[in-house]
């Protein structure tokens, strides 16, 4: 089949063809960038937190309405830890001050030298009297976990800064690379909390592969975390994080809450939550955006397909006599079908070419304004393929109806 007759027909009635091509171009530009954003957001939401088997982890926040003095609070924390360890199905318990991905907790500035004017980084400040490495399943890539003699018992109301100097610190690999770039090992190095003369030194005794901050930021600072061995009184409540046996999470959570409620010496407020729910809450907006963009993309495909079907149906109606003449002159059904498919392919190709340029332009705008990653060429190739296939499928119905028109019906005068 020659392309020239098809092109001549399109040039004589180019308004419809231009509208379809424009619709394809705009849809391709939006679709490719929307799916690129979806891929980015889903990759962010799927980032590992550093916590092994999150589906088995939960925590209980405890708030005693009558706290008691420092010694009473220390005794209560130890007793509650023992109570939770005794719950059937609890494999590990650790006291802590905050949890990853909760968007609530403490952050400290850290430096490699107290003489620094500016901090090296801002890092999440986790503290524990037990082993977060064991309870959370953190991967220790260098050094060791804390010893019992390194744990400080601090009174938040009375102890001064000198009393709260950590005896050790465990940091993440990302933070180690930030504070001491290129260092072969950071074990034994001193990490300073703060800068200047008041900075608190702590020897690095361990490095974990990954531990997200409480904010779980998208940038690399989302893994800038520190853990220090400490137990604190007169804080903002107490948090116990636990690992349950596989498949026992719901039961263990209920029994752990009941055990704390039963052994409490006074009024107490308990709040239990799973790490899996924290992940859902943290990335709820990302997932909602992804579904919204997917919905928009599907609607665009449906609208584009409807436009192609409508335009092709109109052309079939307008060309009934022309089709009948061609059939009378010996054109086969497959020739008529091929004519409309080729015509649609030409229109779609123009739209795809324009859509690729629009996609690149839109992506450059997003890169400059929102610091997004550049659009991979795979999205352009995939998008082009989708619209070529969509065009062929959408036009097939009207084209088949055109191919079934009989010469006598098409040429019959009104």
Where are the model-predicted features located?
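"Rare, low-scoring activations can occur
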Residues: 81-87, 167, 173-174, 198-290
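Alpha-helical transmembrane segments
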Residues: 26-55, 367-371
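C-terminal membrane-exit region of the final transmembrane helix in multipass inner-membrane proteins
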Residues: 2-6, 383-414
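Hydrophobic alpha-helical transmembrane segments of multi-pass inner-membrane transport and secretion
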Residues: 12-40, 286-321, 349-354
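Transmembrane alpha-helical interface segments in multi-pass membrane proteins
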Residues: 300, 313, 321-367, 381-382, ...
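Membrane-helix entry/capping segments
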Residues: 1, 8, 12, 16, ...
């Amino acid at each position: 089949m020659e392309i020239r007759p098809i092109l001549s027909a399109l040039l004589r009635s180019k308004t419809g063809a231009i509208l379809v091509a424009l619709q394809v171009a705009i849809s391709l530009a939006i679709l490719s960038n929307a799916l690129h954003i979806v891929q980015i957001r889903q990759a962010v939401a799927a980032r590992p937190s550093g916590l092994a088997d999150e589906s088995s982890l939960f925590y209980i926040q405890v708030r005693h309405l009558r706290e008691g003095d420092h010694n009473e609070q220390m005794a209560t924390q130890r007793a509650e830890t023992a109570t939770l360890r005794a719950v059937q199905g609890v494999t590990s318990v650790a006291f802590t001050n905050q949890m990853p991905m909760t968007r609530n907790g403490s952050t400290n500035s850290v430096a490699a030298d107290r003489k620094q004017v500016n901090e090296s980084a801002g890092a999440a400040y986790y503290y524990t009297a037990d082993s977060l490495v064991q309870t959370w399943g953190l991967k220790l890539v260098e050094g060791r976990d804390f010893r019992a003699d390194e744990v400080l018992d601090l009174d938040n109301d009375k102890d001064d800064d000198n009393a709260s100097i950590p005896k050790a610190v465990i940091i993440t690999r990302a933070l180690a690379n930030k504070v001491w770039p290129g260092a072969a090992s950071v074990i034994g190095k001193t990490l300073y909390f703060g800068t200047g003369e008041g900075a608190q030194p702590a020897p690095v005794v361990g490095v974990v592969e990954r531990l997200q901050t409480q904010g779980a930021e998208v940038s690399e600072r989302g893994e800038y975390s520190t853990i220090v061995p400490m137990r604190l009184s007169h804080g903002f409540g107490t948090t116990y994080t636990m690992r349950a046996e596989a498949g026992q999470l719901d039961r263990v959570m209920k029994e752990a809450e009941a055990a704390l409620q039963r052994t409490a010496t006074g009024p107490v407020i308990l709040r239990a939550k799973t790490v899996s729910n924290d992940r859902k809450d943290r990335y709820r907006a990302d997932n909602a955006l992804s579904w919204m963009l997917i919905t928009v993309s599907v609607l665009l495909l449906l609208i584009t397909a409807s436009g192609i079907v409508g335009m092709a149906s109109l052309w079939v109606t307008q060309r009934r006599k022309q089709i009948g003449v061609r059939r009378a002159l010996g054109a086969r059904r497959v020739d008529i079908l091929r004519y409309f498919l080729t015509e649609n392919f030409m229109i779609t190709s123009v739209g795809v070419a324009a859509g690729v340029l629009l996609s690149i332009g839109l992506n450059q705008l997003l890169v400059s304004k929102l610091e997004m990653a550049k659009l991979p060429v795979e999205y352009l190739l995939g998008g082009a393929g989708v619209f070529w296939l969509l065009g062929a499928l959408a036009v097939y119905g009207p084209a088949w109806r055109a191919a079934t028109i009989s010469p006598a019906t098409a040429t019959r005068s009104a």
